[in-house]
Amino acid sequence: MKPIEATFDEATDGSSPIMPGTYPAHVVTLVTREFDSGSTVFNMTFKIADDAKDTKIIKQHKNGSGTYEAVLDEKGQPIEMSAGYMSGKTFYANGVWLTPEPEKGQGWKNRKYLESFSNLGIDFPRNDDGVVSLAEVEEDDVLGRPAVVRLTENEYTNRNGEQRTAFKVDSILPWESGKRLSADEIADDVPF
């Protein structure tokens, strides 16, 4: 082998993995599916915003067993880095269900629907007693809306019976200072 000057150190040169955590994002798609029961599932896709550069995370690298661990400085402290590398990545959210006519005592089934879309800035009307009147959210209502999303790693079994993992949005939180993207800003991000 011919020696050269190039080196590679996984701790400093390795790629940055997707990390669980909370990130600023925007809704870029909404797909709904109605079931025979009358319930509808709302599936959103979120795109991590450029503002993620202001989010600090612990730098990770692959260890010898193929899992990730924190990169430590010379004092043994975890090294922080910007999450800017997450900007532009898209993640599916866990589906949000709307049950238009829940059985008596099962109105709780619509809590996640109300919370998720309220956290996106959707205002549902309330009567004088404070009871919320739900409405079916449409794509134009949510596209481009800002949120802080929590990414978690989920395990699943694929159709071949193999264990896999994927990152999904499991919580949608308000992003008070976030700005809604226009349809043009969302369309500019389409790669074709």
Predicted segment positions?
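Short beta-rich binding modules
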Residues: 1-192
